[in-house]
UniProtKB/Swiss-Prot annotation:
PANTHER family according to UniProt: MITOCHONDRIAL RIBOSOMAL PROTEIN S5 (PTHR48277:SF1)
Pfam families, sorted: Ribosomal_S5 (PF00333), Ribosomal_S5_C (PF03719)
Domain S5 DRBM: 12-75
Gene Ontology process terms (BP): translation
Recorded GO CC terms: small ribosomal subunit
Database matches in HAMAP family: Ribosomal_uS5_B
Family: Belongs to the universal ribosomal protein uS5 family.
Superkingdom to which the source organism belongs: Bacteria
Quaternary context: Part of the 30S ribosomal subunit. Contacts proteins S4 and S8.
Name of the protein this chain belongs to: Small ribosomal subunit protein uS5
Function in brief: With S4 and S12 plays an important role in translational accuracy.
Keywords assigned: Ribonucleoprotein, Ribosomal protein, RNA-binding, rRNA-binding
Protein source organism: Myxococcus xanthus (strain DK1622)
Gene responsible for this protein: rpsE
Amino acid sequence: MATPINPNDLDLTDRVVNINRVAKVVKGGRRFSFAALVVVGDGAGHVGVGLGKANEVPEAIRKGGENAKKNLFRVPLVGHTIPHEVLGHFGAGWVLLKPATQGTGVIAGGAVRAVLEAAGIRNILTKSQGSRNPHNVLKATVAGLKLLRSAEQVSRLRGKDVEPAKLAGEQRG
């Protein structure tokens, strides 16, 4: 297990991806509450996703931000892109993440874009299919990012030496 990331050591920015109003029907009518899906990141490889629920929107966003800070993880970066292609699944949704060359930009929509920008990824190609629910798309993106391994990590797992000239990610930016 990796060492936990202390959110106080990072300069985190948060971004609200989705706010959902939920109604509970009671004898006197409807009682509304809110659920906020929040992404936090430092733009340098650390990102977290959280869900906050409360009777008021600002409180739900605050709780979502706190929850996201508890779920921070590190994304291995090669320049401003990812080291290799990966497919993240969650529920009925899946997200394909492909590394891109310098100048491509973030080709992603909605929830996927929020996570990638918070992580500091500036050049990437994505495709999300299946579920269009922001919760499922967000969690599929996070699942994909957690599957990423740097060349150094793979070489350590395989017991091989890394030759700098053979790193495929060095041509990307």
